[in-house]
Amino acid sequence: MKKNKNILVVAAHPDDEVLGCGGTLANLSKKGFNIYTLFVSDGVSARNETKDIIRRKIEQRKLAAIKVSKILGCKIPEFLLYPDNRLDQVPLLNIIKKIEKKIRKIKPETIFTHFDSDLNIDHKLVNKAVITATRPVKNFPVKKIILFEVLSSTEWRFSKKENFFQPNFFVDIDKSFRKKVLAAKAYKSEIKAWPHPRSLQGIKNLAKFRGQTVGKNLAEAFVIARLIK
């Protein structure tokens, strides 16, 4: 049987893919997997700036995402450009249908997306849309749904113990961490100064913490939401 080597990353904002699974994507692309990325929100329009500045920054963010795709070895991403931090104002069915359309087109076996209890409302709704769009009916291509963490969102939420991010899948990114950092730097407007968690030092600290948890130098951690064998 021919192995399905298509992977889909569904992220709320351009930069979430780097923070959540940038090293893992670099590993997978090196192994010959075809990685497609779907960005749901523009990641910018919630800011208190003029429309002209917002439009310019959206274009800059798109260009950065395309640059990142080349660094990590992914396909050129697709942008839905729904309003930033306002996905709760978009009919969920609209987002679901866009994800279903992408799945029909590329037939991925694996999907990476957000953890369902993140603080950010867009992250939560993207997770909900993905889970709905991937109902495991007969002959459905998606066999794995893997949830990633995003600095300054996953760890900032207030949640019950059962909704805490408890990873059960770790990926060694010691050899791909340099690419993760290069990709993060491409989103220069999103990288903050230490001690913000979304700083370069914060990114490395999390990778070291996740790595030491499983006896590795650097790692990314995930929750496997669904695995069908």
Residue ranges and their predicted role:
Residues 61-65:
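Generic hydrophobic, amphipathic alpha-helix propensity
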Residues 40, 79-83:
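Short glycine-rich catalytic loops that host catalytic nucleophiles or stabilize transition states
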Residues 38, 69-70:
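Residue-level marker of intrinsically disordered, low-complexity segments enriched
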Residues 19-20, 60, 94:
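Short, conserved clusters of charged catalytic residues that mark active-site
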Residues 1-10, 27, 31, 52, ...:
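Metal-dependent de-N-acetylase/amidase catalytic core
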Residues 5-14, 18-55:
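ATP-dependent adenylation/pyrophosphate-handling site
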